Amino acid sequence: MLSLCPDWCWQYCDEQDRLVLQLSNSHHIQTAFSAKELTTKPEQQSLCMEQAQLLMDFAEALEGVLPDSDLLTVAAQAVAALSFVKAPVQKSHLFNFSSIETRTDLMSIAKLEGLSRAKVLLVAKADPMVDCVLLEPMELLNGKQLSAGQLVRVQQNRLMPVQFAPLYALTA
C-alpha cells in the first residue's frame, strides 16, 4: 500500500525543463511535462488533498496491473496531467481506428496504435474524447515519436483493449 508524506510537493525544474514531484531532498519523480505544456510552473506547491486522493486512487487502480516499482511514477504522471497540463489538442488522425469496442473507464489501461503500439492510462473523458498518458514510447502514423508520460487526446474509437499477463505466478 502506498503511503503519502505531507512534505511531498510539486516543483518546476528549470534545469531539466520538467515538472517534478519532490518526495524528499534526494528523491523526486520527474514527469514528461515541459514548461510549454504547463498551465502554471509550481514552486514548492504541496500536494493538495484532491491530488493526494487522486494519486492514491490511480495507484490503487493500477495495483496488480503494473509492477509495484512503477505505481507511484505512473500515478504521479496522471495527477500532474490532470492538475498542471494544458488540455491537449485532439490527435485521433495520428492513430489507427479500432473496430474492437474498448472499455473507457477512467484509471484503466488500453492501447493506441500508430506505426507502433503503446499502452496508455485513461485519465479524463469527455465523450467521445479521452485523455491518455502514454505508458511507453510509440511512433505515430506520421512518423513522429512520442515518449512515455506524454498526454494525448483521442476519440474513444482509437482505443484497443489490452491483455495482461499475470504479474504473479499461480502457486499450488
What positions do the PLM features span?
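Short beta-strand-centered aromatic/proline hotspots
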Residues: S116-V133, P137
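N-terminal, helix-rich and Lys/Arg-enriched segments in bacterial and organellar proteins
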Residues: P6-D7, L122, V130-D131, V154-Q156
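Mixed-charge, low-complexity intrinsically disordered regions
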Residues: M1-R117, E139-A148, F164-A172
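Structured surface patches comprising rigid loops and adjacent beta-strands/short helices at the edges
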Residues: G149-F164
